[in-house]
């Protein structure tokens, strides 16, 4: 609806040309009485030429249009070519259509911006990547097209409430910054340990055993040398179960003990057996 339709009730009066006759003097008017003033809500009309016996009229004051901010925004969007406008374009439409909003723009522009963000009937449309410019577009929700009675912006039926906010459609592929990534391939299942694989592992053969220290024979002859070595151990696990080499028999140890007795008793501080043919003078390196 055009904004000037609301103010079309006033009759159109002829205008005064600069070369026309000058208005007569108002000396015959009653003293102490002001001329009549007509207050309206639209644009000012040109002063009418006072005829004989008529009083002079003042210019009409600029009144506020009888439209709410929601109606002003909906009016601007309805007159847009693509039914969408930026915030700056909405400001421009209002100031060009209504002269009242040309003064003090900061007050009413804040109200326009708040009504755009707080009312569900207005939807923000992002700007396409290939469309340069500043700011997003605003459009009217298609479900709110019948928000006003009979297309009149003076009467609004009820507050529009959107049940769910639909997501804006994604831009087409040429305008997308990156092509859509393919779906990742399913990961292979994790490898599980099986009992057969654990039993099939071969144990590494252990390293060479440290040589056992020789038995120390006490000076007392009543204690037989290497008696502890000749006694069998309390517990001897099966060597084939542990994968260890079989222990040495006790006969070489007894033979070694016999050779130690033939060499004679150990002196004080000697904790080793001197083998035959050992060169003298090397004990200090042991």
From Swiss-Prot:
Q: Which domain of life is it from?
A: Eukaryota
What are the UniProt keywords, alphabetically?
Answer: DNA-binding, Nucleus, Transcription, Transcription regulation
Residue ranges: DNA binding:
64-158
**Pfam families xref list:** Forkhead
Region Disordered: start and end of each range?
1-62
The regions listed as transmembrane in this protein's record are none
One GO MF term on file is: RNA polymerase II cis-regulatory region sequence-specific DNA binding
Instruction: Show the SMART domains listed in the entry.
Output: FH
**Localization per Swiss-Prot or TrEMBL:** Nucleus
Any GO CC annotation of this UniProt entry: transcription regulator complex
Q: Which GO terms describe its biological process?
A: anatomical structure morphogenesis; camera-type eye development; cell development; cell differentiation; ciliary body morphogenesis; cornea development in camera-type eye; epithelial cell proliferation; eye development
User: Is Nucleus among the key words of this record?
Assistant: yes
> What function does this protein fulfil?
Transcription factor that controls lens epithelial cell growth through regulation of proliferation, apoptosis and cell cycle. During lens development, controls the ratio of the lens fiber cells to the cells of the anterior lens epithelium by regulating the rate of proliferation and differentiation. Controls lens vesicle closure and subsequent separation of the lens vesicle from ectoderm. Controls the expression of DNAJB1 in a pathway that is crucial for the development of the anterior segment of the eye.
- Name this protein carries in UniProt: Forkhead box protein E3
Q: Which organism is it from?
A: Rattus norvegicus (Rat)
């Amino acid at each position: 609806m055009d904004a000037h339709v609301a103010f079309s009730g006033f009759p159109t009066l002829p205008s005064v040309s600069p070369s026309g006759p000058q208005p007569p003097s108002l000396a015959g008017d009653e003293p102490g009485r002001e001329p009549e003033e007509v207050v309206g809500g639209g644009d000012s009309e040109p002063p009418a030429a006072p005829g004989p016996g008529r009083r002079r009229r003042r210019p009409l004051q600029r009144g506020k249009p009888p439209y709410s901010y929601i109606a002003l925004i909906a009016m601007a969007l309805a007159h847009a070519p693509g039914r969408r406008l930026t915030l700056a374009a909405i400001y421009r439409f209002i100031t060009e259509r209504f002269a009242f909003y040309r003064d003090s723009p900061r007050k009413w522009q804040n109200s326009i911006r708040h009504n755009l963000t707080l009312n569900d009937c207005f939807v923000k449309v992002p700007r396409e990547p290939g469309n340069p410019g500043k700011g997003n577009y605003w459009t009217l929700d298609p479900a709110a097209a019948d928000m006003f009675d009979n297309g009149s912006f003076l009467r609004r039926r009820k507050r529009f409430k959107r049940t769910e906010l639909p997501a804006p459609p994604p831009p087409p592929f040429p305008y997308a910054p990156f092509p859509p990534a393919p779906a990742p391939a399913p990961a292979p299942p994790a490898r599980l340990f099986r009992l057969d694989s654990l039993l099939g592992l071969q144990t590494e053969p252990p390293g060479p055993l440290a040589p056992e220290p020789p038995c120390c024979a006490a000076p007392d002859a009543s204690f037989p040398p290497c008696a502890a070595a000749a006694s069998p151990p309390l517990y001897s696990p099966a060597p084939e179960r542990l994968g260890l080499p079989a222990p040495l028999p006790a006969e070489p140890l007894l033979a070694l003990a016999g050779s130690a007795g033939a060499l004679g008793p150990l002196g004080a501080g000697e904790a080793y057996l001197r083998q035959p043919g050992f060169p003298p003078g090397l004990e200090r390196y042991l």
